[in-house]
Amino acid sequence: GSEYRQLEGFTRRDWSRMPVNYVWIGDGHGMKMKCRHPVHGRPFAPEVTFVIDGGTRFVVGWSLDLAENVFAVAGAIQHGIRHHGKPFLYYSDNGSGETADILDKEVVGILPRLGINHPTGIAGNPQGRGIIERLNRTLPMRIARKYRTYFGKGADRETLRKTNRDLRSAFTALQQG
């Protein structure tokens, strides 16, 4: 599995010769914070999807959604294309949001119609996308820590317990009118 692969040797890619906008790498990550769900109003943790340029490590696109799905991925890619042009290749994992027909289908898929190649990583091998995995460990946490409802690493457990109690109480009060 992936734990064993961490012990094995690996080949580090040389991204220094990669042209800008040649390879984009994308992945979604759950935010370690709670906010109000726009449909039912209960507290939930939103999903953020980042797309970065492989050569420069610059975040070219992002999307915030209710869950990691094809619309979140497409939104992040759209944001990137709108602001930075079209990549030659979009590299991602094999998640359902990344490999849906809306993105990949030969004739009607967004990526083939734009002429963007879409290879995916080996299932269970996040090391192949280490650049985006590293970003997902740091950037969403820095964003989420700015909110009182942050529940990730380093959050005060007692404060978190009280905050969750207050959130549940507020939701109940809203439902009762």
PLM features per residue range, with description:
Residues 1-50, 58, 71-76, 83:
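Mobile-element integrase/transposase regions
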Residues 24-25, 91, 119-120:
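A structural signal for short, well-ordered beta-strand segments and their strand-loop junctions
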Residues 27-30, 52-56, 64-68, 94-96, ...:
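Short, flexible loop/turn elements at secondary-structure junctions
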Residues 33-35, 60, 100-101, 121:
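Short helix/loop capping segments that flank catalytic or ligand/cofactor-binding pockets
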Residues 39, 62, 91-94:
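A short, structure-level motif marking secondary-structure boundaries and short turns
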Residues 45, 67-106, 110:
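Acyl-donor binding region in acyl/amide transferases
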Residues 54-60, 85, 90:
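Coil-to-beta-strand transition motifs
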Residues 96, 100, 104-177:
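Globin-like tetrapyrrole-binding proteins
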